[in-house]
Amino acid sequence: MDVKTTQVQVGPHRIAATVFGDAEPAVVIEPAFGGSAQSWFAVAEALAGQAKVVAYDRAPYGASSRAQDDRTPREIARDLHGVLDALGIGRPVVLVGHSAGGVYARAFAGLYRDEVAGMVLVDSAHEAQEQVLRGQLPWRVGLLEALTLPMLGLLPAKMLNGADRRSIIREFRASKRLTAADRPLAPGDLGDRPLIVLTRGPGAKVHPSWQLWRDLHAELAELSTNSRHLVADDSNHYIHKSEPELVLTAIRDVLDSARTGVPLSQALTRAPGTGSER
């Protein structure tokens, strides 16, 4: 398997990226708060025989350089665009956005729509979540998990460093200032580009806050006329860790639909029992 790790200069930042495989369209992974490329390597390796996969450390995380505080999703999307240019990645690409990475993936699509072939949103944050959820906290569990996963051995131990933890908290606080006006895309803006939205499971008890979270994700599914919304019944916020095959299948289905033009309603090959349709 062809794997290349490098650092590229994008504006004031040195950004670390690893590229797996060599088929097109490329799959580009945008991690969660504090997430590093390494947390997605297992997924990237599994896809490398079918697509070129770009996993990068969003500044200031992982092996990338420090970045200014409170950058906007559009600034982060422009950084990603610079990374793809520096790596010579052809467009359009399939974007995979996890948690806050979903906001950044949509910001990228808002700025560079013609460079997006499809999208997978993995328990994505939503620009209106603060207003809709108001004091209900299921989506904030993602932050707590980002801070505790290193202790479980699921993310690099360096995330226990104070500087990285402070960066996660700053990014989290910046996300709280997002409003509906910050949405880069309206329903239908992705046209018929394939889109799969994955939502974490409700847990042992279905709480009204989870239902609101699911409804926000149903709204995200309306960005494309060629979309699916699936609930990962057995997963927490880190679906790519708890149900990796569901995430892999979603990415493969979006790739297939982007390549062939066959709608997801006909192409979905998800194994029974791995998630429920919404």
For the regions a language model picked out, list residue spans one by one:
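N-terminal cap/lid segment of alpha/beta-hydrolase-fold proteins
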Residues: M1-R14
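Conserved serine/cysteine hydrolase catalytic core
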Residues: M159-A232
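Flexible "cap/lid" loop of the alpha/beta hydrolase fold
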Residues: V120-L152
